[in-house]
């Protein structure tokens, strides 16, 4: 057992280094945050030499946030405390990372900034030290396409005074920058890329303002698009038609470049939330869908980006069958596939002729 994994069971027993209070932290960010908007985050997402195009690139991504309806269906309070990760989600993250690394791969994590308010962040440092990148998922899990204050996040709708006098664009930009500064302050390194809370059917197309915001915040690539696909009737087993529709949607989940030069590495259907909340599937149906999606990508030397959440997987897949399945499929493919992070995928698409 790792030292940080053991410490999670001690309810923040390590008092040697006091975490800054919320007031102290935001005061620090207010002084440092301007550097992000003025180019201080240029090193956040570097796109250098591309990987070869003769193999499928398979990514396993875990969003570090709590999700409504998990572990119990009546759990909805997480909407207001997305980053208050419980011990089970942290342990799941560490063990999933250990398993994937043992197979020669990495997991790309995305954390909401609220996570860095927790007293013990050693487990996040351990993930990074073991080669697993951690990206920015905004501070409060905000809706980056919002144009009205009440649409930004549940928390701000209930407490509008927190954003009074600011435009939605200002709130969203600040929320992104706060997550970056929180990571730098608590972990000592900058985020590896950016993922939007929620996936958008058309990504950031039609929103050049948001694309430019991402570039201004120092991100050369983002993960925003999540293509449309069928779910079937909630609670019913996945039918062939539903699974065929999910496979068909993989073509719409391939990475691309916006006119602004921003790269998007989409999330591949179906996500764990889509499977266990929307479709109310059993684990075996989710495994079938993931197998078909990964096999589609391997056959075409394409990209598959598994979108999951430790807070959703630990009650639904306690034996890590999903990550083990992906690792096994890539191993069976030999030199036709590799498990990589999203930066590696972004490098390949950025280098492709357009």
List the predicted regions and their residue ranges.
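N-terminal secretory signal peptides and thylakoid transit peptides that target proteins
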Residues: 8-33
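N-terminal twin-arginine translocation
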Residues: 18-24, 35-50
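CE4/NodB-like, metal-dependent polysaccharide N-deacetylase domain
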Residues: 93-106, 157-201, 219, 257, ...
């Amino acid at each position: 057992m790792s030292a940080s994994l053991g410490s999670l069971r001690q309810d923040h027993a390590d008092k040697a280094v006091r975490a800054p209070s919320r007031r102290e932290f935001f005061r620090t960010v207010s002084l440092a945050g301007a550097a992000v908007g003025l180019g201080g985050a240029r090193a956040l997402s570097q796109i250098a030499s591309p990987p070869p195009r003769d193999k499928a690139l398979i990514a396993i991504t875990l969003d570090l946030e709590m999700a409504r309806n998990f572990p119990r269906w009546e759990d909805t309070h997480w909407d207001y405390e997305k980053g208050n990760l419980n011990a089970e989600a942290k342990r799941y993250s560490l063990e999933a990372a250990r398993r994937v690394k043992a197979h020669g791969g990495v997991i790309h994590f995305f954390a909401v900034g609220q996570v860095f308010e927790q007293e013990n962040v050693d487990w996040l440092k351990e993930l990074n030290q073991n080669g697993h990148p951690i990206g920015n998922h905004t501070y409060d899990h905000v809706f980056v396409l919002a144009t009205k204050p009440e649409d930004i996040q549940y928390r701000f709708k209930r407490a509008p005074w927190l954003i009074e006098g600011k435009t939605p664009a200002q709130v969203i930009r600040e929320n992104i920058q706060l997550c970056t500064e929180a990571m730098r302050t608590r972990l000592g390194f900058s985020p590896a890329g950016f993922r939007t809370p929620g996936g958008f059917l058309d990504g950031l197309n039609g929103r050049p303002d948001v694309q430019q915001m991402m570039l201004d915040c120092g991100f050369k690539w983002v993960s925003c698009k999540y293509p449309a696909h069928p779910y079937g009737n909630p609670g019913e087993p996945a039918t062939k038609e539903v699974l065929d529709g999910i496979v068909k949607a993989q073509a719409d989940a391939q990475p691309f470049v916006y006119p602004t030069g921003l790269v998007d590495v989409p999330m591949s259907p179906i996500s764990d939330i889509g499977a266990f909340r929307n479709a109310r599937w059993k684990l075996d149906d989710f495994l079938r869908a993931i197998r078909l999606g990964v096999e589609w990508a391997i056959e075409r030397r394409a990209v598959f980006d598994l979108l999951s959440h430790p807070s959703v997987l630990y009650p639904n897949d306690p034996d890590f069958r999903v990550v083990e399945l992906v690792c096994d499929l890539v191993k069976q493919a030999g030199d036709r596939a590799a498990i990589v992070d999203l930066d590696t995928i972004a490098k390949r698409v950025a280098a492709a002729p357009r």
